[in-house]
Amino acid sequence: LFSTVAQGTGVGVVEASTVADRGELSTLETLPERTQNWTRFAPSIIHTSAGDKVRTAFTELTGKAPVLLAGMTPTTVEPEIVAAAANAGYWAELAGGGQVTASVFDRHVAKLEEELEEGRTVEFNAMFMDRYLWNLQFGSQRIVPKKRASGTPIDGVVVSAGIPELDEAVELIHTLTADGFPYVSFKPGTVDPIPPAVRTANAVPP
């Protein structure tokens, strides 16, 4: 029971529930193996003039609240909810799954710019495996980088619905960074793409 509770704390757990287990304790020649220590990743509270705030690696990196509005079609296709979340200090993603033509995207961006307070930014959630949308938004037509270049306050790209191969992912990060996006992230939809996403992160200097 306790071994489950102790996961991530760095505490060592020794089995002593049977006579045999307790007998082995008297002949141990090495220290018990400890669990992994994940405490350095835990959130913490910081005290500011504006009140207590939650501090995480995410808040340190982005300066935004530790809860985000993830891109999801159709929920965050429309700009109003995205702008409202961004204005409240949250990371807020415009869902690329609903930006199906350049004219639709133009209309949504115009409304977004109208609704956003000065200094606020949003992020764009792109569907990598949808070849039509990817080519429209970041491939041959590049409507999102073009908007960024024209001053639209989109400061991040979240690559979802598929993870590129390592070389392609690294090249994509360099390209999007050069396009003016300081934040490029990958959103694994299942367990299997998590290791490739981690390898990509390790391959790119912070």
PLM regions and their residue ranges:
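Active-site entrance/lid segments in N-terminal catalytic domains of soluble metabolic enzymes
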Residues: F2-T4, G10-E15, D21-P206
